[in-house]
């Protein structure tokens, strides 16, 4: 059957072109001429992972750990940022990028047949960008990058530092019918984004959010927020 030990090691490779056109400029008859150019932007990321599972008659065990770069396509906190812009005179207009690195590990256990005890535990840590971001402003001697000029954490929040979840539960099985009750405890450590009001070209004031340019993180005023959730599910398997 499917009982026994299974182990896997793998790598997720992602290579994308964030833009295909951009602004460039050249000197023509003594004038600086700006134009839209086709650019060769590209970011390539490598995310290694390990996975192991064990299945016995009554006991099941699974564990996975991944070190992700720009892992939003794997439903992880991710994204990438801009490290350099070649928008100067006689430059081709391309940008350089760096990924957000994210470590995520979890373990899942189940024991029993008619009555089953289950436990899930997971931890994730934002490790920041691999290289420093292109700074947009300096505040109190620290370089900051505007989130709107980058592609950070589009599916979640750029100010998440780390998080953990613990979810114990119990399942009662009646053949194809199962009733489960789970208690999810989730805690997230947030940092405080730098928020500054900017006067735009049309004279309007808008609030911009910034992360530290050194690592793409928000590490000021770190604080934990914990959420408790009870979840009950009735399932019938055809």
Regions found by a protein language model. Give the residues of each.
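Extended, charged low-complexity segments
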Residues: 104-109, 210-211, 215-227
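Substrate-binding/catalytic groove segments of enzymes
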Residues: 116-118, 128-130, 174-180, 191
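C-terminal beta-signal and adjacent terminal beta-strands/loops
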Residues: 176-215
